[in-house]
Amino acid sequence: MGGSSASRNQSSLLEDTHTSRSLISRLFSRSKTRHITDFHIRPVDPHRKYAKGDHVTGAVVLTVLRPIRITHLTVALHGFVKVFKSPNAAHEATINTAQIASGVTNRTRYLGNGLASLFQDEQVLSADGKLEAGRYEFNFDLVFPSKVNLPTSIDFERGTISYMISATLTRPTSITPTTVCDRKIYLVEKVDIGSIPAPRPRTISLEPISRRTRRRRTDRPSTLGGADRGSSLGDSHDVTSSDLDSSRAPESVAAESNIANDAAFEGQQAPQSPTRTEMPDVMSEVSTESAITSSSAGASVGYKVSEATGSSSGSQFGARTPTVEEKTITASVEMLKGGCLPGDFVPVKISVHHIKRIKSVHGVIVTLYRQGRIDSAPPISSFQGLSKEDVRRLEKEEYFPRSKTGLSGLSLSSAGSCSVFRKDLSQAFGPLIIDPITLDASVTISVRVPEDVFPTIKGVPGELISFKYQMEVIVDLGGKLASQISSVQSKAGGISAGGAMPSARNPYESGGSSIMGSWGNSIIDTDQLRRHKGVISVVFEVPVGSVDSSRQRTRGGSLRPNPQARQPSQATESSQIPTVGYGPEDKQRAQSEPAGQEDYVHSHGSQGNGPMGPSTEYVPSPYYTPHDPRQQHAPIYIPPPDVPNDMGLSEKERARRAEQRLLPSQPPAAPFASTLSETTLEDIYNVEDDAAAGPSSAPIVGNSNGVATAPTLDEVESGEAAVGNSEDKLERERHRLLQEASAPPDFPEDYDTGDPGPSNQGPVTSATAPALSFQPSAPILSEDDEDPGSSYFNQHTSTGDYMGAGALGRPITAPHEPLPRYQR
């Protein structure tokens, strides 16, 4: 018995040891029954951002260890929208791609529980058969639909818009017959902002309300009981609360319609403020006198917000004063751009007409924010193409039952299916300083759109997910917002808390017309600032796109006009020669004229031939040197230099010839240079423009090395290869005069020649003026002069040419003072 028990214990110990070893071996060793080791999708361009209508190519990689039988292998490209009911639901369950409809379809389907299918494109890679051991790659080519609105891919804590490539391998087995692998790709919706116009400007008027002639109701009894006393207090509450509520602007776009309703409700027996629910009901415990005092804050005139100024007869607050228009505050807010791209600046112009002088350092606050909206249980009626069975199934599976009236029965506000959230992206501040003379102020503030934002998302089926960008403009018409911002800074505890407003300027902002106060992550909360008295708020929607066709047309689509097409006829040239001045009077006259009268090519000659469209070309400053229209002929063709063939030469010889081609031309002979020096000695400022003044512009006499150089413009015009030394002095002088006549003036016309005369004398515009008129203005100093400045001043003040016409405040010397020549 003892031996049998010992053998039994030993056998059980051996079985336990074998079992433990088998478990360890299963953990660390590859399973022998596994037939497929690798199954994944490899797209050709995995990091590409696709658009609708693009082709998605790639391959499905499959590695088989043992021969297996398959039913079919398919690959599908599909897009879907999923909204989670809670922020934690994104990590609880994954989306079952098998639930999405199979096949090729471009129709949107709602599958319930916040899941909707956008489209699906399926392709069969392999049919029924047997796969031997090896590595297989099945290529595919899928297409995004081009006629379906596909929103941009996005993943966030409350939902997702995803596009995936799913490969499904089906085997003829009862246990796990399908094997699925997914690969996510990204799509960006093409939102063109080039054709979006700028929104209409919003105008808000604050009209005065006189409280001193307020009428009391006569149907009230003289003694106030409990109910009557409460009614009287309620009436005073209505008056004061309406004034308080109407003195501030609406907080959203939906509340803008309430501004116009404020004036309509004013004439009723029991006026109700459109924003009554936002204020606590604390006015019923105070008296009428204290209520008026607290609401007016020491002032006897209040204001109400309205879209247009007008009188409302029968108002219970009393008759209007005759100076209503004079005491009306008007604020106009205009967004200067209809749309923007990531990284752009969005300018906003604020114009205020006030009744008194105010100065607010932070009077204008512009905030760019993104507003997202999700709906986990959209109405089934928003989806088309659902069968009766699908409608019946979706009504049973709907988490939030809806009644026929649309009120959803008795439910809490937090139990709704819609959620709206806001994310502040950028903020800018600007001062509001009213001019004490005109009582007007105009401020332009630019807000920069961050570069990492995604385009506006709209048009999702059932409005499951939507993202839009809005611009909130807050204007302090009371001048008391600076103290509130400072209190917010003190409560926030500094700039690091994120609630303070730094004084740093936008590093990307250029130009002094726009103001950018805040930059970075320090964005203050404007929710409390909107509720202050005398503060108005206007909201614009800013579409953020991905492309701008208007910029592309401006860069590459516009063609410069042909100068020959604008060439005037010879008969009208003499009568339509433009006169471009350079003096102060001419500058003022040029600024007062419209910019369309002078474009880059000076098309003045075609003004009388017919109407011209608006010019989009660059308009130069009047101080630039203009081209003479009498010289606007056909462009002269300059042939390329005749470079000899140096294929047979050595590398050293080719380098030497290339170096010689970079050197200037050889100077002329000594006798020729001596005669030219006498001709050009007086005109020392036009040396660079003369044809034979310097070595670089002298004609080519000869080249001992035989290296070809490009012919000059003078050679092409005269038709000669070179100007020989045999030409006489008169011929060379004629060439020089022709070049001076065709060249633009070297000096602006505001350069006074020093001739004393009346101030209204026009500047010398002739290009062939003698060189004596351009003499230097430096005085000649001698060693005997102790105080050359005083003698110089006395000399020119006596002649009256110290401040000549067009001198621009600089001393002008007489033309008889030559410039000292340079001597080595």
From Swiss-Prot:
InterPro entries: Arrestin-like_C (IPR014752), Arrestin-like_N (IPR011021), Arrestin_C-like (IPR011022), Arrestin_domain-protein (IPR050357), Ig_E-set (IPR014756). GO terms for biological process: ubiquitin-dependent endocytosis. GO terms for molecular function: protein-macromolecule adaptor activity; ubiquitin protein ligase binding. Residues 235-248, 649-660, 726-738 have a biased composition (Basic and acidic residues). Pfam families: Arrestin_C, Arrestin_N. Residues 564-578, 758-768, 791-800 have a biased composition (Polar residues). One of its GO terms (cellular component) is cytosol. SUPFAM superfamilies: E set domains (SSF81296). Residues 197-281, 547-824 are annotated as: Disordered. Belongs to the arrestin family. PalF/RIM8 subfamily. Required for the proteolytic cleavage of the transcription factor RIM101 in response to alkaline ambient pH. This is pH-response regulator protein palF/RIM8. The lineage of its organism: Eukaryota, Fungi, Dikarya, Ascomycota, Pezizomycotina.
